[in-house]
Swiss-Prot record:
Subunit note: Monomer and homodimer. Part of the essential Sec protein translocation apparatus which comprises SecA, SecYEG and auxiliary proteins SecDF. Other proteins may also be involved.
Originating organism: Corynebacterium efficiens (strain DSM 44549 / YS-314 / AJ 12310 / JCM 11189 / NBRC 100395)
Gene name linked to the record: secA2
Name of the protein this chain belongs to: Protein translocase subunit SecA 2
Alphabetized SUPFAM superfamilies for the sequence: Helical scaffold and wing domains of SecA, P-loop containing nucleoside triphosphate hydrolases, Pre-protein crosslinking domain of SecA
Top EC class of this enzyme: translocase
GO molecular function: ATP binding; protein-exporting ATPase activity
Family: Belongs to the SecA family.
Its job: Part of the Sec protein translocase complex. Interacts with the SecYEG preprotein conducting channel. Has a central role in coupling the hydrolysis of ATP to the transfer of proteins into and across the cell membrane, serving as an ATP-driven molecular motor driving the stepwise translocation of polypeptide chains across the membrane.
Classification of source organism: Bacteria, Bacillati, Actinomycetota, Actinomycetes, Mycobacteriales
PROSITE patterns in the cross-refs: SECA_MOTOR_DEAD
Length: 763
């Protein structure tokens, strides 16, 4: 394997973190296993604690051996050498590339246990509550074997239940719930009210989904102060506008532009002289643009569904309903108005944090995914994380057929149906990956017209996903699914109990069909990875048309000539190379979006750290009382009869109230600046530089204003033996709060999000 050292270095592996060293340690672990198996449980657990007595493993090979023996005794699962290698790489802080079905759950639990034995608090981060609870219960015997505690966080838990879970050595939780708890803990006024304690390590499952696909998704904590819903009149007027007459849409359907005729129609209907007057640019024009985006670009059953009278967003990277997500308030309200639903108020944002900033809070981060190699650049650039490739336990027997490329989408769709029907006729199970709800349902209807029974897994029925996926490998099954990333359940050949395994193997295993290329090869490979699990046979095949989104977007401004046959099929390596080029272009666009958006978010994230540090000092010391009593000595002197502890808490409540309020107002201001910042390009100002200039200036004002406001309140508010009567002074904190995730780019993959594209209305 030494010949592959160059490959490891290309992936960012540091010297010493290479295949050769890892495999040598795993071989040593195998030798240790024979000696250690004679120990009883108590002595084996004691040996593990001895190995990490000073907080670092004295002998990594022996620690791997102990963990492997314990896994076998408690779970009946003996790790393969490649799994032990993955455990080692996680413990040393890498992201491991492990194929689907290679046992990531066990690997993560062994690594968490090994790190827990070193005295570290470990958060094992999943993508949803179901997997967090499932994995915690499944792996509990292994963790507890060594006297460590394990807990799980889920959405329905009370603060006390969360507090108890976070006290554990190993905590399983979804990335959103852990993030929301961070935000809620930033509103406490007494340290004892915090639910979390500082964690040392994050082990992230589906690391590329969390660290790349959703890195810039903001988690939001909001309070019950009404926001501003867009005016209904604008929605009604925009609804009457006609495409190509009143507005035009860009070729990639990512941006919409008002024509002069459209602007005139709006001005007449709204009774204003010009949309572009100063009084309307930051208000009416922004609302018009949001309504236009909602009307022309956001499509029901592709970007969202309507269920139970509510707009529910579809997570583009997973093809399921994003229960906790909403768009920025103006856009959310615009879509609700478009669908004739009750417009929800967004409330006042109290605090927010992106997943990328959340992950940055952990001193050590590692993770697992089946498609880490494709995300190497992003992982190294944004997180300084290195990728370690773990070989399969059994050789890959999946056959990846060359793409079948068609001239038109109609010809492609016809060929897809014919291929599925052909495979189904043989009895071979077929898993079809589509891009959105509408496509999955149209394809399923077409197959049912051919009397083919179809199971559909999409955002409308994701509650059934575990059952549908488990059955997808049985004889004659046809399963149509939106994105397969992070589904968390393996497709087993022969059905859930593998009773028809031999017959399905004889038929060639699971056949995976992609109805189009994704915007990144990584998502294609996530779908491919469902076939050929643990050495099983399998087939993967992608269909592409020259009208597909990835080709149109990635090939914009360029062209390719090709001669299709009578069915529309283009059998040309040159065209296949062209399609791959188009995909690379869209991948580059996504990386640029990430880079640009992070530049906007980074400064706020840095400012947030300063706020966190200030908050911690106010919570944990008497700083608030010292500052206020010094600034308002006469008031402090008049409170000498009040108990010192009460005074310190009263000062703390006052200081924290105004710090939190000013931070919330700063976030709202910077959100407004961000929405209109691209208008500054018209004035030949650099938007990013101007945004940073405003953010720095306003943050300096925030710091001083928070203290000045607190001093003024301290001078006037009633303070007695019960503390500061802030509510009586009209300074109550929100009586209700709620959390959600903001889908900042509903047209994910475009060069402009709805928000960053406000200026585009000027054409």
């Amino acid at each position: 394997m030494a010949g592959f050292d160059w490959f490891w270095k290309a992936l960012g592996g540091k010297q010493g973190r290479n295949q050769k060293r890892s495999l040598a340690i795993v071989d040593q672990a195998e030798a240790h296993t024979r000696d250690l198996e004679a120990l009883d449980d108590a002595h084996l657990a004691a040996r593990a604690r001895t190995l990490v007595g000073d907080g670092t493993p004295q002998d990594p090979a022996e620690l791997l051996a102990v963990l492997g023996i314990a896994a076998h005794r408690t779970l009946g699962m003996r790790p393969f050498p490649v799994q032990s290698q993955a455990v080692l790489r996680l413990i040393e802080g890498d992201v491991v590339h492990m194929a689907t079905g290679e046992g990531k759950t066990l690997v993560g639990a062994m690594a968490a246990t090994g790190l827990g034995l070193q005295g570290k608090t470990v958060h094992s981060i999943t993508i949803n509550d179901y997997l967090a609870v499932r994995d915690a219960e499944w792996m509990r015997p292994l963790v507890e074997f060594f006297g460590l505690s394990v807990g799980a966080i889920s959405e329905t838990m009370t603060p006390e239940q969360r507090r108890e879970a976070y006290r554990c050595d190993v905590v399983y939780g979804s990335v959103s719930e852990i993030g929301f708890d961070v935000l809620r803990d930033q509103l406490i006024t007494r340290r004892a009210d915090a639910v979390q304690r500082r964690a040392d390590v994050a082990i992230i499952d589906e690391a590329d989904s969390v660290l790349v696909d959703e890195a810039l998704v903001p988690l939001v904590l909001a309070g019950n102060q009404p926001g501003h819903a867009p005016r209904g009149k604008i929605t009604e007027v925009v609804r009457r506008l006609k495409e190509n007459d009143h507005y035009t849409v860009s070729e990639d359907r990512r941006n919409v532009f008002l024509t002069d005729k459209g602007a005139a129609a709006l001005e007449q209907a709204l009774g204003i002289t010009s949309l572009y007057d100063d009084e309307h640019v930051g208000t009416t024009l922004v609302q018009v643009n949001l309504a236009l985006h909602a009307q022309a670009l956001l499509i029901r059953d592709i970007h969202y569904i309507v269920r139970d009278g509510k707009v529910q967003l579809i997570d583009a990277s997973r093809g399921r309903v994003a229960d906790l997500q909403r768009w920025p308030d103006g856009l959310q309200a615009a879509v609700e108005a478009k669908e004739g639903l009750a417009v929800t108020e967004g409330g006042r944002i109290l605090d927010t944090i992106t997943l990328q900033a959340l992950v940055g809070r952990y001193p050590m981060v590692c993770g697992m995914t089946g498609t880490a190699v494709e995300a190497t650049d992003q992982l190294r650039t944004f997180y300084n994380l290195h990728v370690s490739v773990i070989e399969r336990n059994n050789p890959l027997r999946r056959f990846d057929e060359a793409d079948r490329i068609y001239a038109t989408m109609a010809e492609k769709n016809r060929a897809i149906i014919e291929e599925i029907a052909h495979l189904h006729h043989t009895g071979q199970p077929v898993l079809v990956g589509t891009h959105d709800v509408a496509e999955s349902e149209e394809l399923a209807d077409a197959l049912r017209d051919l009397d083919i029974e179809v199971s559909v897994l999409n955002a409308k029925n994701d509650a059934e996903e575990a059952r549908i996926i488990a059955e997808a490998g049985d004889i004659g099954r046809v399963t149509v699914s939106t994105q397969m990333a992070g589904r968390g359940t393996d497709v087993r050949l022969g059905g859930p109990d593998e009773s028809h395994y031999d017959q399905v193997v004889e038929l060639g295993g699971l056949a995976v069909i992609g109805t189009a290329r994704h915007r990144t090869a990584r998502l294609d490979n996530q779908l491919r990875g469902r076939a050929g699990r643990q050495g099983d046979p399998g087939l993967s095949l992608f269909f592409v048309s020259l009208e597909d989104d990835v080709v149109v977007t990635g090939g914009a401004g360029e062209s390719v000539t090709a001669q299709p046959d009578a069915t529309g099929l283009i059998d040309s390596n040159r065209v296949r190379d062209w399609v791959a080029h188009c995909q690379r272009v869209t991948e580059g666009q996504l990386l640029e979006i990430h880079s640009q958006t992070w530049k906007y978010n980074k400064l706020l994230a840095d400012q947030r750290v300063i706020i966190d540090e200030r908050r911690a000092r106010l919570l944990d010391t008497d700083l608030a009382w010292r500052e206020l009593s010094e600034r308002a000595q006469d008031r402090a002197a008049g409170l000498e009869g009040v108990d010192r502890e009460v005074l310190e808490q009263a000062a703390r409540d006052i200081m924290l109230y105004h710090l939190d309020l000013n931070w919330s107002e700063h976030l709202a201001l910077m959100d407004d600046v961000r929405e209109s910042i691209h208008l500054r390009a018209i004035a030949r100002e650099t938007p990013l530089d101007e945004y940073h200039r405003i953010a720095v200036r306003e943050f300096k004002t925030l710091a001083q204003q928070a203290v000045d406001d607190a001093v003024e309140t301290f001078r006037t508010v009633v303070i007695d033996d019960r503390g500061a009567h802030l509510e009586d002074a009209g300074l109550a904190r929100p009586s209700a709060t709620w959390t959600y995730m903001v889908s900042d780019n509903p047209l994910a993959g475009s060069g402009n999000s709805v928000i960053s594209g406000i200026g585009n209305i000027f054409r």
